[in-house]
Amino acid sequence: MDPVAIENVTPEIECGRFPAKIVVNSKFTVTAEVFRAGHDLVYPVLMYRKLKKRWRSVAMKGTGNDLYEASFTPDEPGIYEYKISAWKDSYGTLIRNINAWLGSNEDVEQDLIEAINLIKDAYKRSSGNDKKIIKRYLDDLINSDLNKKVMILNDNNFSSIIKKYQKKIDKTDYRTLRLIADPEYGGYGSWYELFPRSIGNFNDIIKHLNYVKSMNFNVLYLTPIHPIGITNRRGKNGSRISDKNDPGSPWAIGNDSGGHYSINSDLGSLEDFKNLLRSAREKNIMIAMDIALQCSPDHPYVRDHPEWFYHRPDGSIRYAENPPKKYYDIYPLNFETKNKMALWNEMKNIFLYWISNGVKIFRVDNPHTKPLDFWEWLINDIKRDHPDVVFLSEAFTRENLMFELSKRGFTMSYTYFTWKLTKGEITEYFKKLYSYPYNFFFRPMLFTNTPDILGRDLSMGRNEFIIRSVLASTLSSLWGIYSGFELCENDRLDDTEEYLNSEKYEIKRRNFNSDNNIKDIIARLNSIRDEMPALRSGKIKFCETDNDKIIAYARYNNENKILVVLNLDTMNVQSGFIRVPLNDFSMDLNSIYDVHDVLNNNHYKWSGEYNYVRLIPGKRQAHIMVIKNA
């Protein structure tokens, strides 16, 4: 039986079953309702530590209605633990009562003696500089008049020291919870995806880094770099018929020259790859590696470990299936095979091998088709020794399954952003993602396009590419584009979401200086993201507008306040009034304030909540405004 109630602790993911997440060097705030019967005060503290290190504590502050909060800041990546302990606040209760009795002209002589006894008791438990401070105050108390005694007893600094050492009567502990502190690139990143073979080889990609950097991307994501299978190789646009010139899908991994530990010889050697990693780091670009845990029919695993695959009634190995389609160039692995731990350990070793060669970011293909307990085991095991490694879940599946993968360990996740087009759809979706508890375990990665997905809205041309860029880069701290987006490529295969002449099945040579590109806009968006802390870690508030073709939302934190206003119409000028969330900005409703549109480099003077905007497609599609007091 617990004499102190500790309830509604946040964040707490599924009663502590899963850890919360934060980015290193970010303040982590814990709140809880803490109370006890009667009129006695409680003294709750937040205990925290990095796993296996010494516990630290910070007193929780009351914010009203039995709600308390406290914070700590993880200063390095890794697993942390936190919990709340609380006990009767004997000293605080007594001082509160003394103040009340004095206000009613009651005699408090015996109560002052009791207070001094509590201080003497705390003195015995104290140490170091705290002991010296208590001794000094105690001497003053004994030799002071009533008014001076009351002033000393109410001194906040002195009180906090006494409460720290007072006897912990009715001490109650809440269960221990976990927190994952990820490196900054696990929570903030601007990604550029490319097919290495379309650039040439690793040395050619090194030369291409300046192009990626010119748009201010800080993560270069490479599609699989392994040998590609020959058997049942797919041809142009995914055709089952191929010829000798078809390079095949990079996701059909493995041939006679090796599998997941090997590099396609057309791209270069392992040393060439490591040189790419070094060259990218020199430009403050990280390399993200694509890991697809599946095999071509030519993968060495098929020969050496046929028991790792699914078998049909006739004994043949089952191809990958996603009804109504079958993928004859890929064999899925059976993660529930009889001796599954041999397979699981081999899969873990693949990640560990590339980690040993310098990779810290993994984009994992189709994780939702593998067991949840496999991912929880693998990621937790890897991050225990490599807390600076992060995992992106490429799962376009049921929402609950996407959330569960993040709970089980994935650092960040693809989203439904591609299919959220209207003001209502965008608002509803991101309100959910930024609400509790999702905001403590699910980090949305907003890709504008992928090799598999050419959004139907992008058929509307350049202005729509700008719209999606602004949305993706400002709605989340994580966003990315697949190569060609900056060139506004939108040739579609029939009435599908697939690209015509898909790069998945052919080598594509691009003119990266073609007309009609939006490279400068993307570069500016990424630059703004780097400059504005609120776009990296701020809260979000969707704003009222009187025009459904205009969406507006604020991103804000203690460092800056951003207002994004966007015309969702690619063809027509749209105008209207937006309601600036001045209350959320801690600004007076009658404020006059400076507005700097950092996207278009314009300055305005606004006043009050409601202000007028006029957005012109092709000229001024959006505002990204920094709000400052005049």
From Swiss-Prot:
Give any single GO term for biological process: alpha-glucan biosynthetic process
Q: Which CDD domains match?
A: AmyAc_GlgE_like
Q: Which domain of life is it from?
A: Archaea
Q: Locate the residues binding alpha-maltose 1-phosphate.
A: R234, Q294, D329, N366, K504, Y505
Gene3D superfamilies xref list: Glycosidases, Golgi alpha-mannosidase II, Immunoglobulins, Phosphotransferase system, lactose/cellobiose-type IIA subunit
- Reactions accelerated catalytically: alpha-maltose 1-phosphate + [(1->4)-alpha-D-glucosyl](n) = [(1->4)-alpha-D-glucosyl](n+2) + phosphate
Spell out the InterPro entries in the cross-references: GlgE, GLGE_C, GlgE_dom_N/S, Glyco_hydro_13_cat_dom, Glyco_hydro_b, Glycoside_hydrolase_SF, Ig-like_fold
Cite the position(s) of the site with description Transition state stabilizer: D452
Q: Keywords in alphabetical order, please.
A: Carbohydrate metabolism, Glycosyltransferase, Transferase
Class in the EC hierarchy, top level = transferase
Q: Which Pfam families match?
A: Alpha-amylase, GLGE_C, GlgE_dom_N_S
Query: GO molecular-function annotation terms?
Result: hexosyltransferase activity; hydrolase activity, hydrolyzing O-glycosyl compounds
The residues responsible for catalysis, as annotated, are D365 (nucleophile), E394 (proton donor)
The Enzyme Commission number assigned here is 2.4.99.16
HAMAP family reported for this sequence: GlgE
Q: How does it assemble?
A: Homodimer.
Per the entry, what this protein does is:
Maltosyltransferase that uses maltose 1-phosphate (M1P) as the sugar donor to elongate linear or branched alpha-(1->4)-glucans. Is involved in a branched alpha-glucan biosynthetic pathway from trehalose, together with TreS, Mak and GlgB.
Stated family: Belongs to the glycosyl hydrolase 13 family. GlgE subfamily.
Q: What is this protein called?
A: Alpha-1,4-glucan:maltose-1-phosphate maltosyltransferase
Q: What is the lineage of its organism?
A: Archaea, Methanobacteriati, Thermoplasmatota, Thermoplasmata, Thermoplasmatales
- Encoding gene per record: glgE
